[in-house]
């Protein structure tokens, strides 16, 4: 019994010694109470571009020539994706809360590139030289946010005349059927304007053949009273009625009805 009590006391001795010596450890207070970094300190960690006000000068510098040469900024960029088929849309943005994601797009990876309507040499790299169409985002690899900025900057540069674009003049290869076909031609004038001409040409009188007339005469020999000729050129015109005759007919009308 005494041996078991002695063993338990010996087992607890090192733990007690640790607690007794814990007051000798000095913990620095600055590790526990730290000041939160201000916004200015966090922003200062992000590299500031010296070409922010004049972004076109960076494309003329030696640093740009050594890095890109004569190729576009998106020429050597490759997207990271799972599988062999890349997604149809790029990421929304590459910079979130002043932190750059892994493998950023060609514009976000270089902090000295700025999308501006005055930076014509950069905008020309994202426009097809033959058709003038802006390259879509999966082709160049830029994120959706930068692609939207590029589209707005290109349109603004075209409005200011900084970015030249050609509007081709295409001549019609086929004939113009707006006035050549009879169904879409101008409406002919009224019959009253053209004397003796019908509204449509097939309404005009056509003399039947003599052979057909002789056959009909033999067929209806006992029933024909008189032969009718062509219709008159114009209907007989009624003489104009005087106001007195018109009033008399108006008065006799109700009496005859009675």
Curated annotation (Swiss-Prot):
The keyword Mitochondrion applies. Keywords: Mitochondrion, Phosphoprotein, Ribonucleoprotein, Ribosomal protein, Transit peptide. It is found in: Mitochondrion. Its main location: mitochondrion. GO terms for biological process: mitochondrial translation; translation. One of its GO terms (cellular component) is mitochondrion. Residues 1-35 form a transit peptide. Residues 229-242 have a biased composition (Pro residues). The modification Phosphoserine is found at residues 38, 49. Component of the mitochondrial small ribosomal subunit (mt-SSU). Mature mammalian 55S mitochondrial ribosomes consist of a small (28S) and a large (39S) subunit. The 28S small subunit contains a 12S ribosomal RNA (12S mt-rRNA) and 30 different proteins. The 39S large subunit contains a 16S rRNA (16S mt-rRNA), a copy of mitochondrial valine transfer RNA (mt-tRNA(Val)), which plays an integral structural role, and 52 different proteins. mS40 has a zinc binding site. There are 3 mitochondrial isoforms of bS18 in mammalia, localizing to 3 distinct sites in the mitoribosome. bS18m (bs18c) binds to the same site as bacterial bS18, mS40 (bS18b, this protein) binds to a novel location of the 28S small subunit, and mL66 (bS18a) binds to the 39S large subunit. This is Small ribosomal subunit protein mS40. It comes from Homo sapiens (Human).
């Amino acid at each position: 019994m005494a041996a078991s009590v002695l063993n338990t006391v010996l087992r607890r001795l090192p733990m007690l010694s640790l607690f007794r010596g814990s007051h000798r450890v000095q913990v620095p207070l600055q590790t526990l109470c730290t000041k939160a970094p201000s916004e200015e300190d966090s922003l200062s960690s992000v590299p500031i571009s010296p070409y922010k006000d004049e972004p076109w000068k960076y494309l003329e510098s030696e640093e740009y020539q050594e890095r890109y040469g004569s190729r576009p900024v998106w020429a050597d960029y490759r997207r990271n994706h799972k599988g062999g088929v890349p997604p149809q849309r790029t990421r929304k943005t590459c910079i979130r809360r002043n932190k750059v994601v892994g493998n950023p797009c060609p514009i976000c990876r270089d902090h000295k590139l700025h999308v501006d309507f005055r930076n014509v040499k950069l905008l020309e790299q994202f426009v097809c030289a033959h058709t003038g169409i802006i390259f879509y985002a999966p082709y160049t690899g830029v994120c959706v946010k930068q692609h939207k900025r590029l589209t707005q900057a290109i349109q603004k540069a075209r409005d200011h005349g900084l970015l030249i674009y050609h509007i081709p003049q295409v001549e019609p290869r086929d004939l113009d059927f707006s006035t050549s076909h009879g169904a879409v031609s101008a409406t002919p004038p009224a019959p009253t304007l053209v004397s003796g001409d019908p509204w449509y040409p097939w309404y005009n009188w056509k003399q039947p053949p003599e052979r057909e007339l002789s056959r009909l005469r033999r067929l209806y020999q006992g029933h024909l009273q008189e032969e009718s000729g062509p219709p008159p050129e114009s209907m007989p015109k009624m003489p104009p009625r005087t106001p007195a005759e018109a009033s008399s007919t108006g008065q006799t009308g109700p009496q005859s009805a009675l």
